[in-house]
Regions:
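Active-site-proximal cap/lid insertion segments
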Residues: 1-118, 131-139, 188-191, 206-207, ...
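Charged catalytic carboxylate motif
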Residues: 45, 49, 123, 127, ...
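Exposed, low-complexity/repetitive linear segments and helix-based recognition motifs
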Residues: 2, 200-203, 225
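A short, conserved beta-to-alpha structural element at the edge of catalytic cores
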Residues: 98, 102, 227-235
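C-terminal cap/loop subdomain of S1 sulfatases and analogous C-terminal strand-loop tails that border
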Residues: 74-80, 107, 122-125, 130-196, ...
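Solvent-exposed, non-membrane alpha-helical residues enriched in polar/charged side chains
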Residues: 51-54, 58, 146, 224, ...
Length: 255
């Protein structure tokens, strides 16, 4: 990572964000290899179990009128940026989650969909309403994915996706928000007013923070505006939240 000291404070002190991160701070390469191998092993087990449940369900009459959704609240560090589990960061490994929908009338696909920028937490309600034939509440900010799921063409309608963080076990409260546009990722943390900006086309590993680069000031301003838009549309109280960083986790040198 370039210019570590220019990263937001919660990232500089990410070793103290989770007890497993504290343990991993002393790992060597073999430890990380074992961790990733175990994670992949457990993922394959879960995938087989999901397949078994779906096969059992759709072999019964109830399967003709049942929609199944597989969703997660977060990803896993997978050793990226030397991180494990999940924590305060918004790197791709942490924010990418499974979002699988199966059921009658849903068009099966052989490969994961990569061209649709979705926000599962707010798109889920209108999607389920439309699939169930229930009126979609007009006051909700999400977009129904039902046409796409049925095999119809549906262009990307969200200009961005968003993610949120508040605290880890209420030990250190360091709220943050992420805005992911088709090309760039912007993050903001209340602690120290920290920001990150990554070009996800040229820097998929999120190694170079562009938030302090004058060449990207316009793009930075655009993504700040997108965050303001998200806060307004979702009535997010982000700006009024308080940072409570335990001094124990900010007492050593960053990194």
């Amino acid at each position: 990572v370039e210019d570590w000291e220019k990263l937001p404070l919660p990232i500089q002190y990410i070793c103290c964000s989770h007890r497993r991160m504290m343990q991993a701070a002393h790992w060597n390469e073999d430890n990380y290899r074992h961790y990733v191998a175990a994670f992949q092993h457990y993922t394959r087990i879960v995938a087989r179990q999901i397949e078994s449940v779906l096969e059992a369900l759709y072999s019964t009459p109830a399967g003709k009128n049942t929609i199944v959704i597989v969703l997660a609240d977060h990803g896993d560090g997978m050793g990226s940026h030397r991180m494990v589990t999940k924590q305060v960061s918004f790197y791709e490994e942490m924010t990418n989650v499974p979002f699988i929908i199966a059921g009658p009338g849903i068009h099966p696909r052989q490969k994961p969909v990569e061209d649709l920028l979705t926000q599962p937490t707010i798109d889920l309600l209108p999607t389920l309403c439309e699939l169930a034939g229930i009126p979609v509440p007009s006051s909700k900010p999400g977009i129904s994915l039902a046409p796409f799921l049925k095999g119809e063409k549906q262009k990307r309608q969200h200009p961005y996706a968003a993610s949120e963080w508040h605290s880890e076990y209420e030990v250190t409260v360091s709220p943050g928000r992420m805005i992911r546009s088709p090309r760039y990722k912007y993050t903001h943390y209340l602690e120290g007013n920290g920001e990150e900006l990554y070009d996800m086309l040229k820097d998929k590993g999120e190694r170079r923070n562009l938030a302090h680069d004058p060449k990207y000031s316009k793009i930075l301003a655009e993504h700040r505006a997108l965050l303001d838009d998200y806060i307004r549309r979702t009535q997010d109280d982000y700006r009024s939240l308080k940072v409570e960083a335990d001094k124990r986790w900010r007492s050593h040198a960053p990194g």
